Amino acid sequence: MKFLFDLLPIVLFFVAFKVAEGQPDAAAAFASQHFGFLVSGGMVGPKEAPVLLATLVVIVATFAQIGWLLLRGRKVDTMLWVSLGLVTVLGGATVWFHNETFIKWKPSVLYWVMGTAFWLSHAVFRKNLLQTLMGGQLQLPPAVWRNLNFMWIAFFAFMGLANLYVAYSFPTDVWVNFKLFGGVGLMLLFTLAQGLYLSRHIKTEDE
């Protein structure tokens, strides 16, 4: 359930982009009429309308996520606050400057922030962030926790680079597809690989 909740802004970004992409002239007119005050020059063109509207949707969705959690008295994860800050700043820049480059950098920056957090927890604070997040759900040797930590660091670094590669090498619609399907697919594959690694080790420990 949490996975779907976390995925919601990405899904809404995808849907908003595809709807606007299917009727760019109407999307441009709608964006100019209702959100022109947020855009430099006050006018939105058909080519840029899909990504600008999708960006506004994802900003609102992220604010709504945090608002929902706060209203229910639940803790807001640190990375969700970071994501809100990034999507507001970079998304706002995309809308104001008519430049999709800013929002395209957002996933990479978020991945690298998470990877840096994992690295700093190990290198500076001598703690294993993954072990802390797991909350004692698994009992593993320090070496295994260390390997898992570095696996996540490498994965976040790779995902940040992969996002930029797609963003700069392919049209925006391909990047939007990758953002949802590629990002989620790679995350699931990595999680599966990590699960296989853990299951093998846990079996060894049980024996």
From Swiss-Prot:
Membrane-topology descriptor: Multi-pass membrane protein
Keyword S-adenosyl-L-methionine appears in the UniProt entry: no
Presence of keyword Protein biosynthesis: no
InterPro entries in the cross-refs: YciB (IPR006008)
Keywords associated with the record: Cell inner membrane, Cell membrane, Membrane, Transmembrane, Transmembrane helix
Cited PANTHER family: INNER MEMBRANE-SPANNING PROTEIN YCIB, INTRACELLULAR SEPTATION PROTEIN A-RELATED
Name under which the protein is recorded: Inner membrane-spanning protein YciB
